C-alpha cells in the first residue's frame, strides 16, 4: 500500500519567540517541532493525521489497525476520536473505570492520558486547536497536560497490547509496553 507523507525542515526561529518560556533549550526545540508539525498538518489535505515521535517502533499492521479502528470507533461514538498506538505502562498506575472496545483486530481501551504519538482527525485538530497551542507555548509538567484535559472532551483509545512501542528508558513509567515481546519487534524492524 502507498501511504502519502511529507517532511518539512524545522525552523526553530519561526516559533521560539512565541513560547512562554526561554529557560530550557531542549524543550524549546521540542515545542517548536510540535508547533510546526501541527501547523503543517492544518494546511495539508488529509482527513486523518498521525503524529509520531522518533523513538517508536510499530508492528507491521499498526497503521491498518489504527485506520480501521478509527473508522469503527468514530461510527460507534458518532464523533471524532483520538487513537494512541502504545499501551503505556504508566496507564496502569491508577485505578479508574474505562471502556473497552473491539477494534479491527485488537481490543482498545479508553485512556485519559498519552504522550505525543497519536492519530486524530484534522477536524479535531482544528476544533481543539487551543489545547495544542497551549501545549506548545508552555512547558507543563507533565508536558502533555493539555492533551489530558482534551481527553475529557474527546475519547482517546489505546490498544491492548500495543501496536507501537515507545523505546525509551525501560526503567521509567513511560517504558516498554506490557504483554509484548519488545525484543522480537525490535529485531523485526532492523
Predicted segments — roles?
Residues 122-123, 127-190:
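C-terminal catalytic/acceptor-binding lobe
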Residues 30-35, 63, 112-117, 137-148:
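Conserved glycosyltransferase catalytic-site signature
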Residues 1-46:
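Active-site-proximal specificity loops/subdomain of glycosyltransferases
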Residues 12-22, 75-79, 149-157:
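Structural alpha-beta junctions
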Residues 54-57:
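The conserved acidic donor/metal-binding loop of glycosyltransferases
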Residues 48, 59-131:
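Conserved catalytic core of nucleotide-sugar-dependent glycosyltransferases
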Residues 1-2, 86-89, 157-164:
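Acidic carboxylate-rich catalytic motifs and surrounding loops in phosphoryl-/glycosyl-chemistry enzymes
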